[in-house]
Amino acid sequence: MGSGRGCETTAVPLLMAVAVAGGTAGHLYPGEVCPGMDIRNNLTRLHELENCSVIEGHLQILLMFKTRPEDFRDLSFPKLIMITDYLLLFRVYGLESLKDLFPNLTVIRGSRLFFNYALVIFEMVHLKELGLYNLMNITRGSVRIEKNNELCYLATIDWSRILDYVEDNYIVLNKDDNEECGDVCPGTAKGKTNCPATVINGQFVERCWTHSHCQKVCPTICKSHGCTAEGLCCHKECLGNCSEPDDPTKCVACRNFYLDGQCVETCPPPYYHFQDWRCVNFSFCQDLHYKCRNSRKPGCHQYVIHNNKCIPECPSGYTMNSSNLMCTPCLGPCPKVCQILEGEKTIDSVTSAQELRGCTVINGSLIINIRGGNNLAAELEANLGLIEEISGFLKIRRSYALVSLSFFRKLHLIRGETLEIGNYSFYALDNQNLRQLWDWNKHNLTITQGKLFFHYNPKLCLSEIHKMEEVSGTKGRQERNDIALKTNGDQASCENELLKFSFIRTSFDKILLRWEPYWPPDFRDLLGFMLFYKEAPYQNVTEFDGQDACGSNSWTVVDIDPPQRSNDPKSQTPSHPGWLMRGLKPWTQYAIFVKTLVTFSDERRTYGAKSDIIYVQTDATNPSVPLDPISVSNSSSQIILKWKPPSDPNGNITHYLVYWERQAEDSELFELDYCLKGLKLPSRTWSPPFESDDSQKHNQSEYDDSASECCSCPKTDSQILKELEESSFRKTFEDYLHNVVFVPRKTSSGNGAEDTRPSRKRRSLEEVGNVTATTPTLPDFPNISSTIAPTSHEEHRPFEKVVNKESLVISGLRHFTGYRIELQACNQDSPEERSGVAAYVSARTMPEAKADDIVGPVTHEIFENNVVHLMWQEPKEPNGLIVLYEVSYRRYGDEELHLCVSRKHFALERGCRLRGLSPGNYSVRVRATSLAGNGSWTEPTYFYVTDYLDVPSNIAKIIIGPLIFVFLFSVVIGSIYLFLRKRQPDGPMGPLYASSNPEYLSASDVFPSSVYVPDEWEVPREKITLLRELGQGSFGMVYEGNAKDIIKGEVETRVAVKTVNESASLRERIEFLNEASVMKGFTCHHVVRLLGVVSKGQPTLVVMELMAHGDLKSHLRSLRPDAENNPGRPPPTLQEMIQMTAEIADGMAYLNAKKFVHRDLAARNCMVAHDFTVKIGDFGMTRDIYETDYYRKGGKGLLPVRWMSPESLKDGVFTASSDMWSFGVVLWEITSLAEQPYQGLSNEQVLKFVMDGGYLDPPDNCPERLTDLMRMCWQFNPKMRPTFLEIVNLLKDDLHPSFPEVSFFYSEENKAPESEELEMEFEDMENVPLDRSSHCQREEAGCREGGSSLSIKRTYDEHIPYTHMNGGKKNGRVLTLPRSNPS
């Protein structure tokens, strides 16, 4: 089934200006204009969409019963942008979403509609989401989404942003209707959605297509033109979307017409409008014209040019100029030649007459067969009144409604180039009410060749016929039997012989009849037979039933030619005449009779023959779909199913087949943490009770002993009428759908073509009571054990039952579980069983009252540091599945506290841990929450938490003694170590601690033997609340949390909280706090800020400023257009890159002013705040994530060689100048969106390349200004590189107005240094130690070496070890830095 346009079905190339959603803005790619497609039965033809950008016609994908989800996983057609007619999906199994199939479908124009709809999704049994996240406009028509049992994400779509009018949308009987969908828009699981929200029916709701794709909502002022990713309005000629604002060449689709890569309001010369959406040239239209003229296929039009349009034919009043295909106005009456493709055109209704409206010349023959109609004469004159000439013959046959032929008011010529059998050019037969031909006083008619034929026109006078002979010039051409003298104008007839049927055979839609031959004395008088038949439920039909003077006739009449007969009576072997009746209704009784059609003459009377009326019934066939299936659950193990018989039983319905199969819960429910704030808890409801009176009686009589239910109020007449209209409309749509999509299968030619009709293997009939309840399916979490074994799909086997009535109680089901039920009607219990198309319905059993209760007591285990581990057993067979647990605990005398435990967290710990409990008596209880709601609370469990400092004095003595001895021993060992260290200074081969993410000098080296002392930075523990994990840091887990009163003027602040692992040693805990002490000295807006320390109690916490967008490297990569986690923002502009550069330079200038050298400046170690400010520092998470950015040289420590300067790689020199080299690489990362530097080179090759004087090439399309900055940073001579203050000075004029208010560059702290300090800064920068407490060492080194270049390098190599600001030496590596070659 194609597009229905004949020769228009050839795909033509098209270069469309389309911006690929999620791709590079403004990207142009080639595509094709493809014809409409009907893809059914299998996926073979689906690949024809591979290169289509536009489907000029409709797209139907339907009736695929053997496809599976994996068949669609690798299928994607990203080039498809627009469908000009409609999109229909119907019964495609295995298809779960359209997001991968049509990721860039943006516009459905609706030029031709499917039953008034442009988008139809009907009975898609596995579809879970639409996923058309780039669909922006449905130009004409509405949306119909119906009977999709798994379809969600419908309530989250704002159709008013896609269609102009949503009142005619029909979206019913989907899973979304039952509120069973846990629709989660992107970002909701993290507590903040990224999707726009709009108001529908008074509800302000986020809009999205799937859990990972928001609905794009443009500003209202953009109307339907669409907008860019930044929300800027497209050009007025755009439709749906664009890549750049106000540019007609950057549209995804065009509002009016498309021409040469841009959208235009109208097609300029020499182009013409075509199909209401594109411009074509004359050659294109000419090719269509000649192609169709030569092919003469039905429905193929010979296109012409008119009013700047390439259209199928000229309108009325115009004729085609064959030289240029133009439609030119006629001079006077306009000849409009209408070609009859089949040679003959039968006019049997007003509709068929309208097809000839405006025609003046008929190239072919006309057959008029009108039996009835309203205002028929006026309608025929309006449509046929302009016909002046007929090239063939005119036949008026059995037109009971005609009284005159005057509606042919301009007909003046019948050429007779094609004649009816017997050489007739005018043929009038059996017109019961025809009284007049024309008013011959006013009408002239010429018949060029051929004869006249008049028979069985009882009300047409012979004088009228003879007048026509004279006027038309045919007098003398007729033979004796051409004009019957006794059947024209005379109703008498004689039929006295009985015809008998000799053979009858039936099928479900055909009847084959044969009867005994009949020949009059002169066999030439037999014109043929007339077969009459009609539906007859009862055997009481007479011949004249349903006929009246107005031409109404309830009989269907078929003209049958007489059998062939030889003129030699001796050799005649007459065969039995017969007829095959087609297109009948199955299992229907028909009344049939046959009579002869013979001629009458004035010389003799010929007697005819007629049969008796017989009754024949067609055979049975497959019944239609059972109507109105309703499913309800009356208990936790039963579902009641009711339905109505099919509208077309097509036989005696003997029984019904019912199949049911348990459905697995949505896999997304296992992955989401429903304890997060803002995440909607999924809900499932069982099937509601019946509402109709019949259903209530049905329930009470068979399944419910109580009759105390309240009655519902009777419905009003308007409600009943509305329900009837909706039911009728729904049935009409389904009939239309089935008539369109179910077409006869082509007969197989023996080539073994696969029959893809839905088939079902016979299942063993089992007792319903023996159905085994299976356990719910659990996802495979890594490293998680569970007491509930996962259930595979094989265990959800289907069951079948044969039912002899229109209801069934399905028992033995699992509580609160969804079931998919199929229902088929069957007739004739025979070996070749006939079962019809299945109806589908979904139902869910009621919840079990105690199924969600936790069995057994809640146990506990108390650990040190006042940590209590609570443990309990999962409910063995919950209602659906458990989504979370609620823990309620309280200390005696305090208020009750509640803790939410997610399913995933419970699986990890088989319970949960309560931390930071104060000493005292506690009670705790737990309850589970399933898809059905909350279970019951467990019985309270009691435990006592002691004060870990409250220990007996004798135990204290036992512990304190050894501690004193260990302390004294440590002091002695430490003294020896320091003495040896002073005598053995570290040289170039000395040890250096390097972490996989080194940044700052650690306070552990500043105060190696100190113990942290609480100060004004101390924060009470109760003011810190942990919300969620951010990742693993150097010492332990890093959390996002809330801190109260930690910043002056803010009641509550979102912070990052670093912790120490429980297994950490005392030294590691001290180092952790000492590292926090280092951060206390940083008070720069562009350096991550310390907010407080919690050192009292366990665990130790360090509270830092929260950087909401993570590290700069991840942030830049997320801005790539093809990134899966793209937040919907475009890549940074030049202005934004300059702002980032200045913020990093300002933070580094501050650190240098504090005499700190970074040594690992990279995008991974810069953090991005909520307002996209970039700051120096991280939360200790990049060590595991980016360890591949480091290189272990010579078996020693890890070094970030791709960011290191030549002198650092060669001599181990780390200075402010080497930081400047790294700063240049950071610039390169910003402009390349965090690509890997020196891609294609190994770490060893990078070492050699940089030490030999090489550096990075600027990225493609890099702004020249940033390229110049990079090259300044990559000067081989360190002294030639700029300082960070100079970088800020170069960029200060292009920065945000807020920069002077917050930056170090403009602060009072950045005062000009004294001359001697300035001199030291430039000359002795390499001597700046990593320990800011070692100023005396700096002075001593400067005096000893005299400031020469060689001395500086040698002195630098004597720097002391250092560690990362977020980690101690445990994550460092001791390595020997390489010596420079003596040469």
UniProtKB/Swiss-Prot annotation:
Residues 979-1383 are cytoplasmic. Pfam families: fn3, Furin-like, Insulin_TMD, PK_Tyr_Ser-Thr, Recep_L_domain. It catalyses: L-tyrosyl-[protein] + ATP = O-phospho-L-tyrosyl-[protein] + ADP + H(+). Residues 1-26 form the signal peptide. Glycans are attached at residues 42, 51, 104, 137, 241, 281, 321, 363, 423, 444, 540, 634, 652, 699, 770, 783, 921, 934. InterPro entries: FN3_dom, FN3_sf, Furin-like_Cys-rich_dom, Furin_repeat, Growth_fac_rcpt_cys_sf, Ig-like_fold, Insulin_TMD, Kinase-like_dom_sf. ATP binds at S1034, K1058, E1105, L1106, M1107, A1108, H1109, G1110, D1111, R1164, N1165, D1178. Receptor tyrosine kinase which mediates the pleiotropic actions of insulin. Binding of insulin leads to phosphorylation of several intracellular substrates, including, insulin receptor substrates (IRS1, 2, 3, 4), SHC, GAB1, CBL and other signaling intermediates. Each of these phosphorylated proteins serve as docking proteins for other signaling proteins that contain Src-homology-2 domains (SH2 domain) that specifically recognize different phosphotyrosine residues, including the p85 regulatory subunit of PI3K and SHP2. Belongs to the protein kinase superfamily. Tyr protein kinase family. Insulin receptor subfamily. This is Insulin receptor. It comes from Rattus norvegicus (Rat). The gene is Insr.
